[in-house]
Amino acid sequence: MYKNAEYLLEKYVEEKDQDKFKILEKIYVPNAKVTFEIDTDTISFPTEILGNKNIAQVLSAEFNRKYDHVQTYYLSRSFPQINDFTISNQGWLVIMREKEDNSIRVGTGLYDWIFEKQVDGNLKISQHNISIGVMLCLPGLPFSFLNELQSKLPYP
């Protein structure tokens, strides 16, 4: 099912953005760990999340209660693979709307991933670091602006 890292990373974006947390939890090993490095005060996450179910809950279910029309994009389709089980400094961009005030959010940062090969040959995520460098809050813009931005980029 998840035989290569590129496919797994596409599934991560789709499941996280579309609030499919039950599927998202399946791409992480049960004892997976997600850590955060956040260089902005316009968004917050816990310092770390332990366990695939907790990860899926925070990154998908809770996140999608606060934001909608979430689309995350990889800034390069060439994943900077260190070896078969590690990808480092994968640039990303997210464009979304905050439900509370309808402000548009645009953020960027880096992902680092460590994968584990399972007995069945599939890869799963064992460690994931999310660095958020910028998270702009753009209040007062029409919803059409969000659609226009998202329509110009290949997803995921």
Predicted regions and their residues:
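Short, low-complexity N-terminal intrinsically disordered segments enriched in polar/charged residues
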Residues: 1-14, 18, 22, 26, ...
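Terminal "cap-and-tail" regions of soluble proteins that handle hydrophobic small molecules
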Residues: 2-10, 98-104, 114-156
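Conserved aromatic-histidine-acidic binding/catalytic patches
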Residues: 12, 16, 43, 47, ...
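A solvent-exposed, acidic/Ser-Thr-rich amphipathic alpha-helical stretch
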Residues: 30-91
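Glycine-centered flexibility motif
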Residues: 51, 107-109, 154
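Short, solvent-exposed secondary-structure boundary motifs
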Residues: 63-69, 99-106
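Hydrophobic/aromatic beta-strand elements that line small-molecule binding cavities or substrate pockets
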Residues: 73-79, 108-117
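Eukaryotic helix-grip
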Residues: 78, 84-92, 103-110, 127-135
